[in-house]
Structures are given as C-alpha cells and as structure tokens.
C-alpha cells in the first residue's frame, strides 16, 4: 500500500538544500514583515497577461511513497510571443543586493525550478524560463537572474530532489506509524480524573477537532497541564495535529509541562520533543558555560522550534 507524503515545495527544498548557516537578511523578523510588501511592489510591475500567487501541485511516486507536493509561485509571466512562460520567484532581503550573485542561494533556484516543473507538466510546455527577483527592502533596488530549462531537465531535477528527500521521508513515516500506535495504546496517566479535569480535556479535544480557539480559566490544582497535553497528544494520533507548542512564561510552569510529558512517555508514548528558551536567560546560562539555543522574539522562537522539531 502506497502512503502519501504531503509537503510544500518550500519545505522540500529547504530540507534538501539545507546548509550550516542562515543568511540573516532573509530570516529576520523585519524581513518577514516587509516581505509581503516587497512581493506586492514587484507584482505591480507585471503585465496584464501575467499572473501572481499561482497555485501549483504535482504527485510524484517514488519507491513505496507518493509525494504530494504543492505551493504558490510568486509570478507566472507571459512573453510577448504568447508562448514563452516564465516562473518568477521573488525574494526580499535587507542585505546588500549588490553582493548577491546568481549562484548565491541554490535553495532559491531549487524552489523556482520545482514550480517551473509543475507549470510545464500542467500546461504541456516543453521549455520554461526561470527567474529569481531580489528586492532590497530599504532601497527597493531589484536584481534579476534568468535561466532556461527544458521540461525533461526540470523533471529530472524534480526526481533528484525527491530522491534526496526520500530517506528522511521514509524514516519519518516509520516513526509516525510507531508514534501513532503508541498514542492509540496510551492511557490517561492517573487512576482517575480530578474534578473539572475531564471537562477541560474534553473541551481541548473538541476545540482541536473543530479547528477553533479555546481560552480556559480554571482553578489551581485541577491538573490543567495534563488536561491540555493529553487530549492534544490523542489528537496527533487521530491526524488532527502535527505538533504541539507549549509556551510558558515561568520556569515552574515549564517544569510542570516537562514532567507531564515524562509521565506520558513512561506510559509508552513515543514522540520527539525539544525545548527552547528566551534570549536573556539563555545568554546568562551561556556565560556559565552551558549551551542553549538563543532566540529573541515570538517569530524567532517559532522559527527555531520548527527547525528543531524535524520529526514528531
């Protein structure tokens, strides 16, 4: 039986083309905030026949897995001949745009080529033009690089990307099978629920199932941590969630969450976890010789957590 691997183009290429350093000009919270504006400024220059934010997808079978890959290309440009199609991938940066060369960021080319493959396959095109457009957010200066590729070359490129991603996808799939089985067999870690605990746990699961938000106020001592963590874990086993972020403002509440997680593990729960903390405390501990991840803002925290939690 073939199992599906659903993944976005960006997630796929960022894994395959990952490197040991991160270019801050593309990763800061400021760049993320201004990125949308930069994209819109470039897209306003498009012609009447051009399109922006075009959804594309493809299904690629490989070994025992079916890769369902999708994304949105920033621009789909039509040449004056009405035949040549260009995929435009826009990247905004706060760095010096003059320092960016054609081969500076292979991951950007990979993303654009994946989109080009999908467009060529969907429209039956034998050749595609691929363009990277960089915009400096302060000066609004732009720099473009253009290459061309045949549909056969793009197909081979796409297959190579999938082949390189496959070992991780297979390992993750096998892990998820074991994880979900452990969740199915997982029991509540206490002999009985405290007063109000079952009601809160039920509300948490229902909220997750309905894709809504829950704000709960409960007295101290009813077991709020386990009442939220346990149903959330069960929701992962049902395919309703992929990951859980448990954010706390104090060390004591963080410890409570870690202890609750340990109880679930002792009951057979098989899942990966990681911990990250704010810059100030991390920096203080770093001076004492301890190694910690250093993050500085809610956006940075979420980005760091997403990188750390590669298998769930």
Stretches with model-predicted labels:
Residues 205-206, 225-240, 260-264:
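Walker A/P-loop NTP-binding motif
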Residues 153-185:
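Polybasic (Lys/Arg-rich)
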Residues 58-155:
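Mg2+/Mn2+-dependent nuclease catalytic core
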Residues 1-79, 83, 106, 110:
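Metal-dependent nuclease catalytic cores that hydrolyze phosphodiester bonds in DNA/RNA
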Residues 209-231, 242-244:
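Walker A/P-loop
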């Amino acid at each position: 039986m073939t199992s599906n691997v659903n993944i976005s183009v960006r997630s796929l290429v960022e894994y395959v083309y990952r490197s040991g350093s991160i270019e801050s000009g593309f990763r800061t919270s400021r760049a993320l905030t201004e990125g949308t504006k930069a994209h819109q400024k470039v897209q306003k220059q498009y012609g009447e026949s051009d399109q922006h934010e075009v959804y594309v997808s493809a299904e690629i079978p490989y070994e025992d897995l079916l890769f369902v890959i999708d994304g949105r290309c920033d621009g789909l440009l039509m040449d004056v001949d009405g035949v040549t199609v260009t995929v435009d991938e826009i990247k905004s940066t706060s760095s010096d745009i003059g320092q960016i060369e054609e081969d500076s960021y292979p991951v950007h080319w990979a993303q654009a080529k994946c989109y080009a493959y999908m467009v060529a396959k969907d429209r039956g095109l034998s050749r595609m033009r691929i363009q990277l457009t960089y915009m400096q957010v302060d000066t609004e200066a732009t720099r473009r690089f253009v290459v061309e590729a045949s549909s056969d070359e793009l197909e081979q490129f796409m297959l190579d990307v999938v082949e390189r991603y496959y070992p991780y996808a297979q390992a993750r799939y096998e892990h998820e099978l074991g994880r979900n089985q452990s969740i199915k067999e997982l029991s509540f870690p206490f002999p009985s629920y405290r007063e109000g605990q079952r009601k809160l746990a039920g509300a948490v699961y229902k909220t997750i199932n309905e894709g809504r938000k829950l704000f709960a106020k409960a007295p101290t001592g009813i077991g709020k941590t386990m009442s939220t963590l346990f149903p959330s874990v069960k929701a992962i086993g049902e395919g309703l969630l992929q990951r859980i972020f448990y954010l706390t403002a104090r060390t004591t509440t963080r410890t409570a969450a870690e202890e609750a997680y340990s109880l679930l593990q002792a009951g057979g729960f098989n899942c990966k976890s990681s911990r990250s903390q704010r810059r100030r405390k991390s920096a203080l501990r770093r001076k004492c010789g301890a190694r910690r991840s250093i993050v500085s803002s809610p956006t940075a925290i979420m980005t760091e957590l997403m990188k750390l939690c590669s298998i769930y």
